[in-house]
Amino acid sequence: MNTNQNTNLKEITMYTDGACSGNPGPGGYGVVMLYKGHRKELSAGFRDTTNNRMELLATIVGLETLKEKCNVNLYTDSQYVVNAIEKGWAKKWRANGWMRNKKEPALNPDLWERLLKLCEFHNVKFNWVKGHAGHPENERCDQLAVAAAKQPNLPLDVR
């Protein structure tokens, strides 16, 4: 994570959420991006995925959508995502060959690698928000994610 905010960069506010029915099961992600009065919403669904993969993918897709380096205030209800980045867990897992400890592999290394690279490019500040607590943008992300997970003929997860 690059927390040195550059005042010459665009300031993006991003909300993300993932949802999964069954865990594993069909899942989806939702993203709401805000910039100077503009709004962009993104969502997609996959079959046979997990909630954590969808939380990660929401964050990744949102950041990958940005066409240039930006300052990003990212809000998610996923403590998994926030803690792994803010507490440095994901970087430690990568340094240890994607192992959480000597016996347990870290889950979702494909997605963590993508997210870490994006965080090295953008200036991202991760913020945790309580899910299902009435925050309008977080609620919208949840609606997008749940609706995406219910679509017919979902593709396989992006593993």
From Swiss-Prot:
GO molecular function terms noted in the UniProt entry: magnesium ion binding; nucleic acid binding; RNA-DNA hybrid ribonuclease activity
Main location: cytoplasm
Gene Ontology cellular-component annotations: cytoplasm
Annotated Mg(2+) 1 binding sites: D17, E55, D77
Residues that bind Mg(2+) 2: D17, D142
Sequence ranges assigned to domain RNase H type-1 in this UniProt record: 8-150
Binding note for cofactor: Binds 1 Mg(2+) ion per subunit. May bind a second metal ion at a regulatory site, or after substrate binding.
Family: Belongs to the RNase H family.
Record protein name field: Ribonuclease H
Gene: rnhA
Keyword Nuclease attached: yes
